[in-house]
Amino acid sequence: ILLAACCMVACRYQSASPSVSLPEIKSDSTNPQSWAYFLQHLPQSKGNILDYQGRPIVNQEKHFALINYDVGTKDLQQCADALIRIRAEYLFSQKRFDEIGFHFTNGTFYSWDAWCRGFRPVFAKPGGRQSFMEAALLREKTHASLRSYLNVVYAYAGTVSLCKELQSADRLDIGTVVIYPGHPGHCSLIVDRGVLDGKDT
């Protein structure tokens, strides 16, 4: 199953489970603390795919399942942003707060810890590197503050910066990102695999 811009692209199986794993396919057994297990058990929602304004999108036929994530009220979460969001949600769920951080397209690294300490990006000139100014009050490391931090990341990160952060994979597996960096680029994330009739699916 591929996660692409918040849609699960796969054959249209009928799923009765609360997660996004395929019901007819025996999935791999993974460590409950692992990235793969987290992806296999993303919360599923029923109903239509909605845009950031709460309106059903036109095409409701290109997905297998719908993740039950609130995307907020701004048009910020595109394909790379969705992957950034899910990775951050995983690290948050594991309480690995110090590992949450992403590069902007121009190469500047910005961590959630810096955001919580009040540092905000400042642009000296268009296309230049950011400096950071202590311009806000300290924030606790809560899920609400994570969402606010990610809104900043979405604005300045994308497939180009995400591609530079990733390592090449020898094989496709759960958690593998398939990415085409560019302006625009695109990326997808494998969230499950299994065995059907003795073959990898």
Regions found by a protein language model. Give the residues of each.
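Sec-dependent signal peptide recognition
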Residues: I1-L3
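C-terminal motif of bacterial Sec signal peptides marking the signal peptidase cleavage site
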Residues: V9-A10
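N-terminal module-boundary/linker segments of secreted carbohydrate-active enzymes
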Residues: Y13-E61, A65, D70-Q78
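Extracellular-facing segments of soluble proteins and assemblies that are Gly/Ser/Thr-biased and enriched
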Residues: T73-L166
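Short, well-ordered loop/turn sites that connect or cap secondary structure elements
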Residues: L166-D173
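Short coil-to-beta-strand transition motifs
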Residues: I179-C187
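Short beta-strand-centered aromatic/proline hotspots
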Residues: H186-L196
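Short solvent-exposed strand/turn elements
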Residues: K199-T201
